[in-house]
């Protein structure tokens, strides 16, 4: 009888150009390689592998070509505008431009690598209310509102979502099949996740918004 330690781990296939910085490792539970993305990152693959992230108030869009199995996941949070207001739904506002860039970068990479826009399906996750006493703004809901509006405006197909509430989520996405596994995390994880997202939020306040991305 073959034991788990006797199973040969296959060689890791090369990632697409531009994603060499993303950490990838063998996931024994799922029998495939998994790419782990952090706040502000995204990953696109043409291989049968998983993409993993942990979300608090940030959101992730999982997008794939349902015919060819090419897809990716992002992980982002919207910045406030310079006046501390909420420009999430204002065309041309900093938040809308930042969020749009986060979505368009990933979609563009999917299309560049063989995906077709007409085949795209979207699943969204995150937007939990885990950062308390930061300000009066519900950061998670703001992120949810943006990504829903973006999907509607761009006429993309939203097939499922698991958003809101007060807990963080671990998301494991398999672009080749569209399958997603969600694990709701306990409160003991909140402090670490909130600290990471607070640091990320602080960085994007001053970070220039990326340039326009032309969609195929």
Indicate where each model-derived feature is located.
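Short acidic-hydrophobic catalytic motif
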Residues: 1-58, 65-68, 74-91, 95-121, ...
């Amino acid at each position: 009888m073959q034991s788990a330690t006797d199973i040969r781990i296959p060689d890791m296939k090369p990632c697409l150009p531009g994603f060499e910085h993303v950490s990838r490792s063998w996931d024994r539970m799922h029998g495939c390689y998994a790419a782990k993305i952090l706040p502000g990152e995204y990953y696109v693959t043409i291989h049968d592998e998983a993409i993993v992230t942990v979300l608090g108030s940030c959101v992730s869009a999982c997008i794939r070509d349902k015919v060819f199995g090419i897809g990716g996941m992002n992980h982002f949070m919207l910045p406030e505008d310079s006046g501390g207001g909420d420009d999430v739904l204002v065309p041309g506002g900093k938040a809308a431009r930042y969020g749009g860039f986060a979505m368009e970068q990933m979609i563009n990479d999917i299309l560049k690598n063989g995906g077709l826009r007409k085949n795209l399906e979207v699943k969204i996750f995150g937007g939990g209310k885990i950062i308390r006493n930061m300000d009066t703004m519900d950061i998670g809901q703001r992120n949810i509102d943006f990504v829903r509006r973006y999907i509607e405006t761009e006429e993309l197909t939203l097939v499922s979502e698991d958003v809101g509430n007060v807990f963080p989520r671990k998301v494991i996405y398999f672009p080749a099949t569209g399958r997603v596994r969600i694990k709701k995390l306990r409160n003991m994880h909140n402090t670490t996740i909130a600290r990471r997202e607070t640091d990320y939020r602080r960085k994007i306040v001053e970070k220039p918004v990326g340039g326009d991305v032309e969609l195929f």
